[in-house]
């Protein structure tokens, strides 16, 4: 048997690849990190499948009750009741967050409260906020989006949801948590401090693009704060059905390149940038008058 000896070129290539591997970093996932020994239980209701670690049943039942109570309320302004969904609760983590995944369709909640927690219970606040995202995404399942769902499954909703701005998703969810809990972020003066401070300054207001994308030089609000102001202004000026109509437009016309902005213009006469200008003008007067005499 003849064994070919490695050439200098092959040895050099191998050493180069081994050297480069030293700079590789593994990916860290916030889900799927639960101990393998963890046993799971579930609670089944008409609208939810709540999956939770063994021993967490009291908090899981509490969360289930909150979700069932919010089911008819959180979707009222969008005129939508979503299909049944799985809710997975993680308690073996230090992360304080939650998210909704369109595919496979589910909610994941991390039960450890943040250090700067609100006065309302963390799981109550988190469950309502994330369930509003469920309503938003499930609302898109209509028209052409539903047809695409037969071809691409749940990925179709994820694709169409990507056409909608993050400020809408998060701002609208903050409205829901503020309306359905005792102390949602929209009720806190500190939540709007970045925009209030900017409006109180004598310099011109930042452009919509800068407020949307952020800045390394200037302090700008995140999409939660910006979105809360824009979505609440839209509801106040054009009715609670504005965002329902916009979502209907996006779900039925996902082929339009700027479907969200076109839908917003169709039902309010404003595009996203002009909505921002109008909202900041209104809030400037609202904050400077001490909230008096505004309607």
What are these regions (language model features)?
Residues 26-159, 165:
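Juxtacatalytic substrate-recognition/specificity segment
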Residues 1-12:
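Bacterial N-terminal signal peptides that target proteins for export
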Residues 30-35, 121-126, 134, 139-232, ...:
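Acidic/His/Gly-enriched intrinsically disordered linker/tail segments
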Residues 19-23:
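N-terminal signal peptide c-region/cleavage motif recognized by signal peptidases
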Residues 54, 243-247:
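Short hydrophobic alpha-helical segments that form membrane-spanning helices or hydrophobic packing faces
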Residues 13-14, 24, 180:
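Cleavable N-terminal signal peptides
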